[in-house]
A protein has these predicted regions:
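Short functional micro-motifs and their immediate structural scaffolds
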Residues: 42, 55-57, 75
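Short, cysteine/histidine-rich loop/knuckle motifs that typically chelate Zn2+
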Residues: 33-36, 47-53
Length: 129
């Protein structure tokens, strides 16, 4: 059973992160950027972790990134990859790498976002080569 066959649980949402999942349903990857210091951050939150400002805003990300680190889980029923992906916007996301040969993964490879459906909720961003 591959990740595509395995049911992905729906993420827990709340009003603070709902715009992230609303955009995902439209095929857009969003990140928060601070209007005070200009730094992007992920996981989305109202207070900037860099300067403490509450002047954060949603910005559409390019969906392009680089594998910073990864691990292939080779457990039954099928292998899957977990990775930290450094986005072009400067934030790092913990995610899955999908739809590719897991043995071909390498740190530093370029990846792009894809959105995968969940059991009963919004799609979630994952990445592929």
């Amino acid at each position: 059973m591959s990740l595509e066959q395995r049911k992905i649980p729906a993420p827990q949402t709340n009003p603070e992160i709902q715009p992230f999942f609303d955009a995902a349903a439209q095929g857009k990857l969003m990140v928060k950027r601070c209007a005070a210091c200009g730094q992007a951050h992920h996981y989305p939150r109202a207070i900037c972790p860099h300067c403490g400002s509450d002047r954060t805003e949603w910005r559409e990300a390019s969906g392009q990134g680089t594998i910073y680190s990864y691990s292939v889980m080779r457990r039954v029923p099928s292998p899957y990859a977990i990775a930290y992906v450094a986005l072009a916007e400067g934030v790092t996301m913990l995610t899955n790498i999908v739809d590719c040969d897991l043995d071909a993964l390498r740190i530093g490879q370029q990846v792009k976002v894809v959105f995968k459906p969940t059991e009963d909720g919004p799609p979630v961003p994952m990445f592929t080569l």
